[in-house]
C-alpha cells in the first residue's frame, strides 16, 4: 500500500550524538506498500521528452549500488546519470552535484538515497530543470538542520547502542588529521549486515558491500542545510519500514513534513539492494508526473478533463430533456 506524506526538528547535538546519525546515509533496495494518490506515470514530461534521471548515493555505498535501477530505467528509454557523491561536506557535495545538474539539458528527476537526500535537497534549489525530487530512505532536511540531528530525532537507528560512546559503536572512525573530530566514518564489517541490510542479503553479497563501502566524513553529517528544494519542487518518498540506519520513524517524519507522495516498503535501509523494482517504480512515477498528487491539490489535469466531460454530458442531457418536453 502506498501513502502520501511530508515532515523538521532542529537542535544542536554533541558529536557523540551526531556521529550515530551519520549511519543514516546509504543506498539500498525494498518491497512496497503504497500510500498516496499520485497520478499514473506516463514516463514523459508534458512536452513528450523523457527526463534525465540523476541518482545520488549516500554513506557506505557508491554509484554501483544503483546498477539494477540504472538498467531498468535505461531499458525504458530514460537517460540516466549515477553520480559519484564525494561524501566530504554537505555544501561541497551539493555544489559538486549542482554543477553536474547545470550541464544537463532538459528536465531532471533527481533521486537521493540516505545522505544523498540531504545533498539533492541543497543542490536542486534554484534549478528550474529539476522537476521532481525522489527520496529513497533519504534525508530531507529543512534549513539549518543536519543529517545527524534528524537521525537522532526518534529511536530506530542501530548505529550505536551506547549514546555516551565517543564514536557510535557500529562505526570505525579513521582520523584525517590532528583534529580528533575530523574523521572518516566506516560501518564495521560485523555490523554491516544488521545496520545497513537488516540481515536480508546472503553472506557473500553482504561481504562484498562491506568491503567496497565508501566512508564519509563526520563533518558532512554535522553541516546544516542552507537550501531546501522540497519546499518548491514536488517530491516522492520511499520509506523503508525496517530501516536500522536512519530509523523508520525518522523517515516518516521527513516524508510527512515535505508533503511527499509516499510509499512504504518492507525493506532495509539499503533498499536498492533488496527491492530494486520498488525503487524503480517510484522513480517512474516521479518521472511520469512531476506535479503534486491529487490528494494535495484536489485537482489535476485528468480531473479537469473528466470534469469538463461530465459537464458537457450533463448539458447535453438537459438539452435533450427540454426538447422532448417541447415536442
Locations of regions flagged by a protein language model:
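Conserved serine/cysteine hydrolase catalytic core
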Residues: 211-257, 262-266, 270-273
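A cross-kingdom C-terminal cell-surface attachment/processing module
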Residues: 302-325
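Active-site catalytic motif of lipid deacylating hydrolases and related acyltransferases
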Residues: 46-104
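Gly/Ala-rich beta-loop-alpha elbow adjacent to hydrolase catalytic centers
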Residues: 111-116, 120
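Cross-kingdom Sec-pathway N-terminal secretion signals
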Residues: 2-47, 61, 70-73
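Post-His helix in hydrolase/transferase enzymes
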Residues: 273-288
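Flexible "cap/lid" loop of the alpha/beta hydrolase fold
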Residues: 129, 135-179, 217
Amino acid at each position: 500500500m502506498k501513502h502520501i506524506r511530508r515532515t523538521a526538528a532542529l537542535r544542536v547535538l554533541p558529536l557523540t550524538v551526531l556521529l550515530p546519525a551519520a549511519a543514516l546515509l546509504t543506498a539500498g533496495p525494498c518491497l512496497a506498500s503504497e500510500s498516496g494518490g499520485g497520478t499514473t506515470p506516463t514516463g514523459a514530461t508534458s512536452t513528450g521528452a523523457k527526463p534525465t534521471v540523476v541518482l545520488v548515493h549516500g554513506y557506505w555505498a557508491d554509484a554501483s549500488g544503483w546498477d539494477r535501477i540504472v538498467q531498468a530505467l535505461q531499458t525504458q528509454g530514460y537517460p540516466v546519470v549515477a553520480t559519484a557523491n564525494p561524501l566530504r561536506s554537505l555544501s561541497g557535495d551539493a555544489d559538486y552535484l549542482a554543477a553536474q545538474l547545470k550541464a544537463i539539458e532538459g528536465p531532471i528527476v533527481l533521486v537521493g538515497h540516505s545522505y544523498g537526500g540531504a545533498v539533492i535537497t541543497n543542490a536542486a534549489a534554484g534549478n528550474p530543470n529539476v522537476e521532481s525530487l525522489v527520496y529513497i530512505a533519504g534525508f530531507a532536511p529543512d534549513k539549518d538542520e543536519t543529517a545527524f540531528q534528524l537521525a537522532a530525532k526518534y529511536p530506530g537507528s542501530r548505529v550505536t547502542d551506547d549514546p555516551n560512546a565517543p564514536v557510535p559503536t557500529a562505526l570505525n572512525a579513521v582520523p584525517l588529521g590532528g583534529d580528533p573530530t575530523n574523521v572518516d566514518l566506516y560501518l564495521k564489517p560485523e555490523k554491516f549486515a544488521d545496520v545497513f541490510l537488516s540481515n536480508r542479503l546472503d553472506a557473500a553479497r553482504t561481504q562484498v558491500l562491506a568491503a567496497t563501502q565508501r566512508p564519509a566524513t563526520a563533518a558532512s553529517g554535522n553541516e546544516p542545510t542552507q537550501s531546501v528544494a522540497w519546499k518548491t519542487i514536488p517530491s516522492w518518498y520511499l520509506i523503508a519500514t525496517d530501516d536500522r540506519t536512519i530509523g523508520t520513524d525518522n523517515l516518516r517524519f521527513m516524508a510527512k513534513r515535505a508533503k511527499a507522495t509516499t510509499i512504504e516498503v518492507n525493506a532495509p535501509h539499503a533498499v536498492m539492494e533488496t527491492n530494486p523494482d520498488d525503487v524503480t517504480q517510484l522513480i517512474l512515477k516521479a518521472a511520469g508526473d512531476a506535479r503534486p498528487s491529487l490528494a494535495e491539490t484536489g485537482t489535476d489535469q485528468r480531473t479537469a478533463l473528466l470534469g469538463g466531460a461530465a459537464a458537457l454530458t450533463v448539458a447535453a442531457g438537459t438539452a435533450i430533456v427540454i426538447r422532448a418536453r417541447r415536442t
